[in-house]
Every structure is written in C-alpha cells, then in structure tokens.
Amino acid sequence: MKNRALFLDRDGVINRDDGYVFEIEKFVFLDGIFELAGAAKALGYLSIVVTNQAGIGRGYYSEDDFFRLSDWMKGVFATEGAPIDGVYFCPTHPEHGIGRYKVESRFRKPNPGMILAAQHDFDLDLGASLLVGDKESDIQAGSTAGVGTTLLICDRDASRVATAASAVVRNPRDVIPFLTGPGPDAGSF
C-alpha cells in the first residue's frame, strides 16, 4: 500500500514569513503547526516539506545556512513528537538567481518537481495526500502533481480569495479536519 503525505510549504505555513528567513533566532513557528504534524503522524501521513528557497539563489544566504536551519527545525518537530520525514527545496530563481542559480527548474514551484521527487522517494499516493501552502504557486504545484487536497493558508475572508485550492484555512490547526475528509464547510470561515 502506498503512503500518504502531508506536504507543507515552509515560510508562511511552518513559520512566520518574514522574508528570506535563514537564522534560527529569527525562525518563529506558526501556532498549530505541531498539532497538525502530530495529527498527521497519528493518522499515518508522512510530513514532507517542499519549499522554494530563492534566497540562496539571490545570494542572501548559503545552502549550508539552509541545511543548518532545516536540521534544527527537524529536531524541534521530532522533540514535539511530530517528525518531518523529508525536506525538498529549490534554491534557484530564473530571473534573480546569481550564477548557477539563475536557471529555470522543474523543482521550483509552481512546477511539481519537488512533489514528484518525494512521490518517487517515499512511494506516495498523491491522490490521497494533502498540500498546505500560503501562495497560489504552492497550490498550482500540488494540483499539477495530482495531490488530492490542496489548502491555502490565508488570514483573509475565504470568500474574497481567488484560489484554485480545495479550501482556504486561517492557520495550520484548521487543516487537521481535512486529514480525515473534506473538512468542515470547506472554503469558509
């Protein structure tokens, strides 16, 4: 039997998006993220991070900085009883990347490359999986890959949000009901 995954974007889903976060002391977890990851784990989902990291390509920080922060983040999740099973990232940017990072990539969202790589690595049933993002590019990547449920985190009224997502939620905690079905009143607050 294939595995199910909870795909999580990083900035804006796992942590507050303060723009190119790469320092541990500036990394602020969003309320409810550990409850979400713990609930997913209890239901047999793998938790997989899929994140564009153009700050590397722009020269704001290094891949080593990203790995250091990711290792720390994974350690915190493990301590909270909600381990992260995989982290996929794309450091390139087609317009603003520097040197080898200035390229188009099938891994950069909205392209589905990171999700498809995880599908291969973890033998995933994408149709039975969920993706949570805070940008339409996250939703597009999930939809293109065939992820069954895509959820957009947004603090605005869902009726005012134009999105292709399955539903709009306010925070990570609001995703939990979707792990077992379509969720309560999908698309509304």
Curated annotation (Swiss-Prot):
It is found in: Cytoplasm. It is an enzyme of class 3 (hydrolase). One of its GO terms (cellular component) is cytoplasm. Pathway: Nucleotide-sugar biosynthesis; GDP-D-glycero-alpha-D-manno-heptose biosynthesis; GDP-D-glycero-alpha-D-manno-heptose from D-glycero-alpha-D-manno-heptose 7-phosphate: step 2/3; Capsule biogenesis; capsule polysaccharide biosynthesis. The active site is at residues 9, 11. It catalyses: D-glycero-alpha-D-manno-heptose 1,7-bisphosphate + H2O = D-glycero-alpha-D-manno-heptose 1-phosphate + phosphate. GO terms for molecular function: D-glycero-beta-D-manno-heptose 1,7-bisphosphate 7-phosphatase activity; magnesium ion binding; zinc ion binding. Its EC number is 3.1.3.83. InterPro entries: HAD-like_sf, HAD-SF_hydro_IIIA, HAD_sf, Heptose_bisP_phosphatase, Histidinol-phos. Gene3D superfamilies: HAD superfamily/HAD-like. Its main location: cytoplasm. Pfam families: Hydrolase_like (PF13242). GO terms for biological process: capsule polysaccharide biosynthetic process. The record marks 51, 109 as: Stabilizes the phosphoryl group. Keywords: Capsule biogenesis/degradation, Carbohydrate metabolism, Cytoplasm, Hydrolase, Magnesium, Metal-binding, Zinc. Its cofactor is Mg(2+); Zn(2+). Belongs to the GmhB family. This is D-glycero-alpha-D-manno-heptose-1,7-bisphosphate 7-phosphatase. It comes from Burkholderia mallei (strain ATCC 23344). The lineage of its organism: Bacteria, Pseudomonadati, Pseudomonadota, Betaproteobacteria, Burkholderiales.
